[in-house]
Amino acid sequence: MNSTIVVELIPEDLKGKDGTVKFSPKDAPFLGVYFSAHWCPPCRGFTPKLKNFYEVANKEKKQLEIVFVSSDRSEAEYNEYTGTMPWLSVPFGNEAIDNLNDAFEVQGIPYFLLFNNEGKLIDEKARTTVENRYPKNGYTEQTVKTIIDIWSSK
């Protein structure tokens, strides 16, 4: 897996909350690439946890950018699912979706990879890293700091 290509495979124009956004990997120290789909029950279970993590991580300053790569079967599903997400997403039907799935040999979803902002793979099992530390009442700043510190040490 050639992780340095991640920043080249993500299209410059991504979908954000308020329309099209120009992608810049340097906007945060860490870049997460999240492969998921509306129709996938494990994804729908993990997405709220990741959203909570993302919001706590970025509360004071931007530490993490996430790019969603959809496996949704229709644009309606994609739009409904991305409507619940605070991060960026590759537009539905964009060729980058297949290119990213192929490059990272995605076998199943949800799949969450974490890179530094230069494209170096930091955590191939970022879903497990985030999910295994999920407290009952949601993430605290301390829990998130612990995970960020783990990633920073790599």
Question: Where are the language model's segments positioned?
Answer:
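Non-catalytic, surface beta->alpha helical segment in thiol-disulfide oxidoreductase systems
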Residues: 102-152
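A short beta-strand-turn-helix
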Residues: 7-31, 56
